[in-house]
């Protein structure tokens, strides 16, 4: 395509997204840290229920806690509410010894709470996103108040990774709520109690959440009195609030980094996102049934140009669902930019009769100027080969209500531009591609039913030999590259910017916000 058309599209999109929207600011007290902890990919989830959360764990883990958690490097899984754990040699029994902890209302945390939580998480009626992922659990036993034993039906090498996201919940506070009424119960945003270093104080709808220090936290009283999470409809407003000192942290896009990197008042934090961005082809829409159409889509997009021009080179092209060298075999199709080949494939598939130039909505929850520019670039490139996409951006709650809806109309989202976690454990990608994970069981929102992909994923999930595991996930890479359930685009770096006034502040650009050991009880701020 012509560069003039490409950059014209980018300029138009940037102009459309130029106006910031500001969230109301709460009064700042001494010893308060305020941040846009849910600014960025995924945005504000619209609820505080960790069983239903697909993101936002950076914030949720400040007051809820799991049994086990990743360290802040996302390299090892360590104990959190479990002071220790062990796995039997046959990998069928997981034994957790619990730490001495209290709920925020003073009641003790016991093994009964852990069993209660896992029973909820395994019950699809609760709206849990973990039901399918925990299906290999045969039983949860509580031999005493400080011991939890999970027994599996078959080995599950990804089980610990899943458990890092299952936040413990209080039986005494939730047992009276019927499972089918739990997902959207007012408790989550009014009087939730956890075991973490901060306690829920109040939520001002769509503006902010305020937490207060938990004086009885087992790791010691937090260094600050309050922790506030501000919500911003526009990332530009969060950046303005950071510069003015209203908040001390926010996520930023790669094209904003240069404005902070040379300013000593701020610290830029960079890391691998472990999220593959992709164009999802809704398999219940006839448009995408022919593989040649999906192949044409890939050849029509100049991913290298987008990465260099818009991401500033801070992304790696993805030719399958992974980019890590150990998981990507040689000799897979790179789907090089080739608009002539794209037109040829569309002609062979009979695209003029399938759809022709009719507009096709591409739905996304990414609301940043960067992604607006990315979609404008894609739109211009695809138009050159005869595919007419029209971007539609909505907030995360609206997006989820559309793509997870049962019995909905597939034409509402024939295409999506989204991202899904593909690490640190490569099994994370399973929930978006395995046919067993089609909603309500999981997050296969494109309703993908591709036997070769499911077979490769199942084999990888079942592999218990660490030496063979990477090879199994290379097979997943091959299957997704050959069958194109998604049009995989890239894995980009992520960035956060923190005020230099923050001390002992830990933020890791983790997929879905973690969780990981951030130790918010140690965060402090220079007055």
Swiss-Prot record:
Annotated transmembrane regions: none
UniProt xrefs under InterPro entries: Peptide/Ni-bd (IPR030678), SBP_5 (IPR039424), SBP_5_dom (IPR000914)
Top-rank taxon: Bacteria
Subcellular location: Periplasm
Molecular function in Gene Ontology: peptide transmembrane transporter activity
A GO biological-process term: protein transport
Signal peptide boundaries: 1-23
This protein's GO CC annotations: ATP-binding cassette (ABC) transporter complex; outer membrane-bounded periplasmic space
Keyword presence, Ribonucleoprotein: no
Keywords attached to this entry: Peptide transport, Periplasm, Protein transport, Signal, Transport
Family classification: Belongs to the bacterial solute-binding protein 5 family.
Subunit comment: The complex is composed of two ATP-binding proteins (BMEII0863 and BMEII0864), two transmembrane proteins (BMEII0860 and BMEII0861) and a solute-binding protein (BMEII0859).
Function as written in the Swiss-Prot or TrEMBL entry: Probably part of an ABC transporter complex that could be involved in peptide import.
The protein's name in its UniProt record: Putative ABC transporter peptide-binding protein BMEII0859
